[in-house]
Amino acid sequence: MMKKNLMLIFGGVSFEHEISLRSAYGIYSALMKLDKYNLYPSFIDKITGIWYLLDSVPDAPELIKRDSSAIISLIPGCGIFVNDEDLEIDVVFPIVHGRTGEDGAIQGFLKMMDIPCVGAGILGSAISINKYFCKLLLKSFNIPLVPFIGFRKYDYFLDKEGIKKDIKQSLNYPVIVKPAMLGSSIGISIAYNDTQIEKCIEEAFEYDLTVVVEKFMKVREIECSVIGNEQIKIFTPGEIVVQDFVFYDYDAKYSTIPGNSVVFNIPARLDMKHLLDIKEYAFLTYKCLELRGMARIDFLIEKDTNLIYVNEINTIPGFTDISMFSKMCEHDGLDYESLVDNLVSLAFQSYAKRKERIDFKRLEN
């Protein structure tokens, strides 16, 4: 049986570029061990956005070679080319975190190219990455969320005092301020009073045009891995215990060694009710957002009340050596290599289902 051609896309014009490189190295290593696919590692430069075909995914960013003779051309309706040679890609595994990778852009382009894509589709990606619109949708399905307010930059500067008053009255201090479309806790800060809120909001606007402000609470941070298309597998949740940080920010996630300031507990220490509720909310969230392939759904449990809240959805979760997504799957018996292989299979299955639905010859006759 001939091997399929798999393109692994990583890097990207994104604040999460460096995390993508680490995730790509893990996935590439797993795919090499599987030896089931012809691999085409494709790197997107952070500054120029140029796509380069690489020989492999190096374990250090400085080893990436930007060879002008290996620039990738993408032509909808024709194919993916390097030096006029069609690579004949059968499936793409995008591991670009944040903008262009998780917002539906790559997914939409690959749909136009008629190439199967690992992970969520256009709609699920676009909604999930935008914290504000995602919360509005989940709220309409009565999924529990931390009290929040969202607004665009234009509206804020049009009525700054009105929005600040609304935050104080509706949420009360302290509050946590987030750019709507960034992951890895980039651009997030906490405001404890009227003086700080303005600074926090304006800092968040440096990253995005929409900001979400949430009530800040003392919480437990629970994460849940989910994979599947029509049939969904929900894995045993894990807990992140943050010891030396106010919340699980970028430094806590990627600049510390697990076991020092951050401890991963898999499984999370939950009573049966909380365990079942979290799995149910994970299932409902996955379905409401029309996700497929994979997602990591993050939860908060308020320490004072024990109430559960859905926090964020990651349609392309981290695959680094310290990422929770694969570790939770591994706890339930699905090792890293098998997880990666399953995700590629799910992409082919989803593509085949979509092609069945869109049978133009049958519909037109």
UniProtKB/Swiss-Prot annotation:
Manner of cofactor binding, per the entry note: Binds 2 magnesium or manganese ions per subunit.
Record keyword Membrane present: no
Positions that bind Mg(2+) 1: 298, 312
InterPro entries with a match to the protein in the record: ATP-grasp, ATP_grasp_subdomain_1, D-Ala_lig_Van_CS, D_ala_D_ala, Dala_Dala_lig_C, Dala_Dala_lig_N, PreATP-grasp_dom_sf
Cofactor(s) required, per the database record: Mg(2+); Mn(2+)
Domain ATP-grasp: 135-345
Disulfide bonds listed in the record: none
EC number of the protein: 6.3.2.4
GO cellular component: cytosol
Pfam families: Dala_Dala_lig_C, Dala_Dala_lig_N
Catalytic activities: 2 D-alanine + ATP = D-alanyl-D-alanine + ADP + phosphate + H(+)
Binding-site residues, ATP: 168-223
UniProt-recorded Gene Ontology molecular function terms: ATP binding; D-alanine-D-alanine ligase activity; metal ion binding
Positions annotated to bind Mg(2+) 2: 312, 314
Protein's cellular compartments: Cytoplasm
Gene Ontology BP, a term: peptidoglycan biosynthetic process
Keywords: ATP-binding, Cell shape, Cell wall biogenesis/degradation, Cytoplasm, Ligase, Magnesium, Manganese, Metal-binding, Nucleotide-binding, Peptidoglycan synthesis
Protein's pathway: Cell wall biogenesis; peptidoglycan biosynthesis
Gene3D superfamilies assigned: 3.40.50.20, ATP-grasp fold, A domain (3.30.1490.20), ATP-grasp fold, B domain (3.30.470.20)
SUPFAM superfamilies: Glutathione synthetase ATP-binding domain-like, PreATP-grasp domain
NCBIfam families cross-referenced by the UniProt entry: D_ala_D_alaTIGR, PRK01966.1-4, PRK14570.1
Biological role: Cell wall formation.
Family listed: Belongs to the D-alanine--D-alanine ligase family.
Protein name as annotated: D-alanine--D-alanine ligase
Organism (species): Borrelia hermsii (strain HS1 / DAH)
